[in-house]
Structures are given as structure tokens and as C-alpha cells.
Amino acid sequence: MVVRSWRHMKERYNLIGTRCKTCGKVYFPSRTVCPDCRRKGELEEFQLSGKGKIYTYSIVYAPPKEFNKLTPYVIAIVELEEGPKVTAQVDCDINKISIGIPVEAAFRRIKEDGKDGIISYGYKFVPITE
């Protein structure tokens, strides 16, 4: 069973942000007001491509308890093609990660919570192999 709050988060599953119709800047997660245009800007829902590159990363060896089974794993800031930067796990061999490699979002199991083992899903990034 997926927790209800996760089923209703467009950002969590589909990388949906907003784009300002006035200046064209893209935001993720979604915003209600454009920080550049302020009230002059009108925002619209925008589907991000999910493609980008590793901006920076860290390898996690001492995770929170719900991530113990994944250790070690990579957490990164990914700069998306549209501009926003997103923090997420990268599903890859820790020896094959480096700054600048191209990645894309993929739907993945994130973690299990509590005694009941409630599974949370969302996006992780995976290297794009050419």
C-alpha cells in the first residue's frame, strides 16, 4: 500500500514544476509566485524532461535507518536541462559516479517505512548510457 500523501504529489512521481509565462524561468518544486517577476508573472504547470547532469554528489555510508539496506548509495544534486537543480539518489555503482555525467529520472522504490513495511516510490536518477 502506498501512503496517500505520496500518491497526490505530482512532483514526487512526474517531475512536474512550474514555468513563468512572463520570463520563461522554470521552477522545481512548483511555485505559486515567480521570484523574478513577482506578481507580474503568471505561472503554468510544466513537465520537466527528467534529463540533466550531476552537479555534485556524495556517497552515503551512514544513512538514516530506513535506508540501511541501500548502503552505500549516491545522493546528488542534478542540474536539469531546463535549469532547476534537484537533490535525489542516483541508482548506480558508486565507483562509476562523477561530476558532469548525464543522467535521467527513473521511477524507483525509495524506501520501506515502519513495521508494516510501507513502500514509498518516487524518482531516482540513473546514468544515461550511450
UniProtKB/Swiss-Prot annotation:
Key words, A-Z: Metal-binding, Zinc
Pfam families, alphabetized: OB_ChsH2_C, zf-ChsH2
Amino-acid positions noted as binding Zn(2+) in the UniProt annotation, renumbered to this chain: 20, 23, 34, 37
Database matches in InterPro entries: ChsH2_C, ChsH2_Znr, NA-bd_OB-fold, Thioester_dehydratase-like
Entry GO MF terms: metal ion binding
Coiled coil regions in record: none
SUPFAM superfamilies, per database record: Nucleic acid-binding proteins
SUBUNIT field: Interacts with acetoacetyl-CoA thiolase and HMG-CoA synthase (HMGCS) that catalyzes the first and second step in the mevalonate pathway, respectively.
Similarity annotation: Belongs to the scaffold protein DUF35 family.
Function: Functions as a scaffold to connect the acetoacetyl-CoA thiolase and HMG-CoA synthase (HMGCS) dimers in the channeling thiolase/HMGCS complex, which allows for efficient coupling of the endergonic thiolase reaction with the exergonic HMGCS reaction.
Protein name: DUF35 domain-containing scaffold protein
Naturally occurring in which organism (per UniProt): Methanothermococcus thermolithotrophicus
